[in-house]
Amino acid sequence: MRRSARCGMGSALLLACLAGPFSLGQAQTGVPPNPPVGLSGAGGPTLAQGMAALKDNQPRDALNDFQRVLVSDPNNVAANLLASTAAVELFQGPLAVQYAEKAEKLDPENWKIHTTLVAAYAGAGMKQQRDHERALLRELHGTGAPDARLATGFLVEMFPIGADRVDAIEYFEPLGRFHTYYRFLVRQPDGKRIREIDVQSDDFDQKSWADAHPAEAAAGDRQFQITGHADDGNTVDYRMFSGKPDYDNIRVMVVEALRSHPLPGSQPAGAR
């Protein structure tokens, strides 16, 4: 039975692994008390209040606070970026894009803005723009600023499934012993994580599969396993598949797994 090391992420901005808005790092523990490092502009107490609201899983209050800052200081990079973050958590994709693109215009060299643009474009259904930003993040991870190189991955998307929320994480390199490519964290409305779904392709299984499917393996395909871990310790092997680790195809499989294997008390239907 497989078990990967969990990254205990809080409800706002994937708090326990945050290196910046929607990027995963190694030593971050929460939303900082001041505007994110590298972001210009001082929003005063209202900006701090909004960040506290994000940390407390109150994105609507946070968005209101950031919008108040932007009324008097529309070019505040931090407020625009954090307003986009709050809009992503509220599944308001077009609004998230509006604020993230404004932040990028004001501070085009800041890689953390691109991590937010990925989730914003995903929420707005803008797949071409989303994938452009994903490719850019991979380039910056290899050649960019130190925090970009230290990050392990980033949030691709937040999407609702019933009353719950799913945070979809993509890793720059397969993570851990079992080579996790994607991780989907399922959260209750209060932000509590109730399930983790990992998309993995470990070398042992891959070797056996490649021996049986040499042509596919030579073309770069792999065998993957989708495994769920509930917070009560139960593990479910949902399915196996072979091919490329395409996010959109995997998302469909994960949503189907959540619908087919609901947790007690959850409302799994209705994912979009």
Put a short name on every predicted segment:
Residues 43, 77-78, 111-112, 145:
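Helix-start (N-cap) detector for alpha-helical repeat units in TPR-like alpha-solenoids
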Residues 72, 106, 139-140:
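Structural marker of alpha-solenoid helical repeat scaffolds
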Residues 82-83, 116:
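Canonical tetratricopeptide repeat
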Residues 55-56, 89-90, 123-124:
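Register position in tetratricopeptide repeats
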Residues 41-72:
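Alpha-helical segment of the N-proximal tetratricopeptide repeat
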Residues 68-69, 102-103, 136-137:
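Canonical positions in the second alpha-helix
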